[in-house]
């Protein structure tokens, strides 16, 4: 069974936490992680690109010259695609790039990235993140006490963490999520994970 050190908010060690190997100790599947990251990045795309076809371009209502007798090619509109200033053919339309992978694939990817963080020593467990009011300075002290210098993803329990979330949202390189909302993309993008002990339990309940 994998074990990680358990810390208090002040940075002192409070013991160890034993992790479920079926969640935090598997052999990472990099191919599945890649597929899920691509899927989640695709879901973030706005998809608001658009073009104007010949019916949407302004003007062009009048036939430019009569059908016969001019010696020129017949034309019905100055906004046909072959004209300068004409409509675009087969251009982009607004659409969603999102697509959904099977649940088991997404869960395997989560297990893989969690296991990688544990194996690399980049998962930090903390017994609690308890704040009596939303104070950015107080959360900054926690980050400093735990010697976290680079980008960190803070994983909170699913409920009852409003002050902790508000305290962290104005800090650079700190992103906050919950046990049920943590995504593969967020975890991969972070250098370290700071996970509350109760959130670890909730993660294991879902993924084990």
From Swiss-Prot:
Q: Name one GO cellular component term.
A: ribosome
Looking up SUPFAM superfamilies in the UniProt record yields: Ribosomal protein L4
Q: Belongs to which family?
A: Belongs to the universal ribosomal protein uL4 family.
What InterPro entries does the record tag this protein with? Ribosomal_uL4, Ribosomal_uL4-like, Ribosomal_uL4_dom_sf
Record's Gene3D superfamilies? 3.40.1370.10
List, alphabetically, the Pfam families matched: Ribosomal_L4 (PF00573)
Outline the segment boundaries, as ranges, of region: Disordered: 45-89
- Per its database record, what is this protein's job? One of the primary rRNA binding proteins, this protein initially binds near the 5'-end of the 23S rRNA. It is important during the early stages of 50S assembly. It makes multiple contacts with different domains of the 23S rRNA in the assembled 50S subunit and ribosome. Forms part of the polypeptide exit tunnel.
Swiss-Prot/TrEMBL GO biological process terms? translation
Keywords recorded for this protein, A-Z: Ribonucleoprotein, Ribosomal protein, RNA-binding, rRNA-binding
Q: Which NCBIfam families match?
A: rplD_bact
Q: Which GO terms describe its molecular function?
A: rRNA binding; structural constituent of ribosome
Q: How does it assemble?
A: Part of the 50S ribosomal subunit.
Its name, as the record gives it, is Large ribosomal subunit protein uL4
């Amino acid at each position: 069974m994998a074990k990680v050190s358990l810390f208090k908010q002040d940075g002192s060690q409070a013991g160890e936490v034993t992790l479920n190997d079926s969640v935090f100790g598997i052999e990472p599947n990099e191919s599945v992680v890649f597929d899920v990251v691509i899927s989640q990045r695709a879901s973030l795309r706005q998809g608001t690109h658009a073009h104007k076809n010949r019916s949407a371009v302004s003007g062009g209502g009048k036939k430019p010259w009569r059908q016969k007798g001019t010696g020129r090619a017949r034309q019905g509109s100055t906004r046909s695609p072959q004209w300068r200033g004409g409509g675009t053919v087969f251009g982009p339309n607004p659409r969603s790039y999102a697509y959904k992978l099977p649940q088991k694939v997404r869960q395997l990817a989560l297990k893989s990235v969690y296991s990688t963080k544990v194996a690399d020593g980049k998962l930090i467990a903390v017994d609690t993140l308890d704040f009596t009011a939303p104070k950015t300075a107080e959360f900054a002290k926690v980050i400093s006490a735990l010697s976290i210098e680079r980008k960190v993803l803070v994983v909170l329990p699913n409920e009852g963490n409003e002050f902790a979330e508000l305290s962290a949202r104005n800090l650079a390189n700190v992103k906050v999520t919950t046990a049920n909302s943590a995504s593969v993309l967020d975890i991969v993008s972070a250098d370290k994970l700071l996970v509350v002990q109760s959130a670890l339990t909730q993660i294991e309940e879902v993924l084990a």
